[in-house]
Amino acid sequence: MMSPIYFAYQLLLSKRMPVMLLALLLGQYSIAQTDSVFKMTKEHGHFFCQTTLNGVNAKVMMETGVPGLMMSEAFYEAHKDSLKLDVKESDEKIRHITGFRHVKYTAQARMQIGDAIFEGPVHILQEDQAITLPLHMLHHPSDSSAIIWLDLSRLQFRVCSRDRLQNLTRKASVWSLTYTQYGMPVVTTPLSIKAAGHRIDITGQFIVDLGNASLLFLNRYDAEVDKLMSDSRVHLIDIHDNRRGKTYSQAFRVDKLTICDRTYHDDTVGVTTFKGLEGCGMLGLKFFTMPVVFDFDENKLYLCK
């Protein structure tokens, strides 16, 4: 089969293709050759991809709000010979918004995830658990860069090399990232909310949680957020976990919300009292209406136009 580069070269010689179009095609070919590409599906507000973990076929959920790669004990036991994890028994509990997860084994691992490299902690849980993949622990195979290009509208993310960053982030706004004690990315930003005649304004730290299907969760465990919520007197409704028969959070409707200089209208904001959650809340998937680039090496978040 004729290679794309040779085919484009022949077209240029025959003067059948404008130079700019040729450059575009070669650029797209270069991207395909250098990026580790993951195609996603959307299910119940979350994003999944079909990939491999050390050669084992697996359906994984995209995340940034977890402290490592997480999988069920059943999946691990079925594939442990291929996964090749050096596990240690654990009695750790991981706090989740709907309750605790019980950790059976832990490991520190470097694994092949599709064409990319995962490096970080692995938690093997007793409960039935979707495999959750923390994007901030993925690295490009050629230079180990932790750069993620994400476009939810195209159902795709890419693990990119360092030399791709400048082209990916032209005209993007830039936000600095810090990290929680568990390594989850955090952005510091002003937040302004208008809801039913009330107004909430705060500048604070928000965990970037790609496992959170909402636009935003506010954390009333933070004293400043709690005071603002009490003073604003917005009407809160309970959100139930039907499987456990418990109320795990609340929510309220907003007329207008601005965060990271991006504005959203007529949406819902969740409210939780999540003991131990750092910062003012969690920024979720519905925020990402634009392509974004995470540079986890240089601690930058780029919001593309």
Set out the residue ranges of the language-model regions.
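Bacterial Sec-dependent N-terminal signal peptides
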Residues: 1-36
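Pepsin/retropepsin-fold aspartyl endopeptidases
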Residues: 33-305
